[in-house]
Amino acid sequence: MRKRISAIIMTLFMVFMSCNNGGPELKSDEVAKSDGTVLDLAKVSKKIKEASAFAASVKEVETLVKSVDELAKAIGKKIKNDDDGFDTEANKNGSLLAGTLQLMFAVGTKLESLEKIAGISDEVRGKVIVVKTENTALITKLKGGDASLGKNDASDSDAKNAIDKSDVTGGKVRKSLFKLNTAVDALLKAAEGEVEAAIKELTAPVKVEKPSQNN
């Protein structure tokens, strides 16, 4: 995101450098380029700001979803008091799975907010809804789809089957996690595309219409 902001600043700088004061009378928020095109800087800047903020929020959702991969690494483990590593504690994964469920609740809350944001395209909003659907499906499976997950002594195999994408047993919960990851990736790509589209308006503005010469 920092690199994208730097690119935006550089683009704005180049636009200002290429502008002059000739041509038709401009509004306070407009600048004219030497080829006769005009930029409404207030409008374009607002679009870029909103698109960037939306993309940043989607990135937060992606980070939460991807963090399940890190939680999965703690299956069957406990903190080792005399070391920086872990000790084995087999088949005690209830709290870990509860933490994963809480994470998905947080994802759901963020998605509710994203869906309500005005100004995003129907395509992007549709992708938000897809992510919400997959997240809800995962929550349902974690919460009540399999009684083996909702207990303190949830086994290592059941926990891996639920949240470890490298597990090859192909459980239903794990399949839902894969679908959620795929949907989030698509949403992030679309959100970043909105930012790029907003930036392109700086380099492809609308031509100023010349006044009619007819008397």
From Swiss-Prot:
One Pfam family per UniProt: Lipoprotein_6
Recorded GO CC terms: cell outer membrane
InterPro entries the record matches: Lipoprotein_OspC, OspC-like_sf
SUPFAM superfamilies in alphabetical order: Outer surface protein C (OspC) (SSF63515)
PROSITE patterns, per database record: PROKAR_LIPOPROTEIN
Domain of life: Bacteria
Entry membrane topology: Lipid-anchor
Protein location: Cell outer membrane
Keyword Endoplasmic reticulum assigned: no
Protein known as: Variable small protein 6
Organism (species): Borrelia hermsii
Gene encoding the protein: vsp6
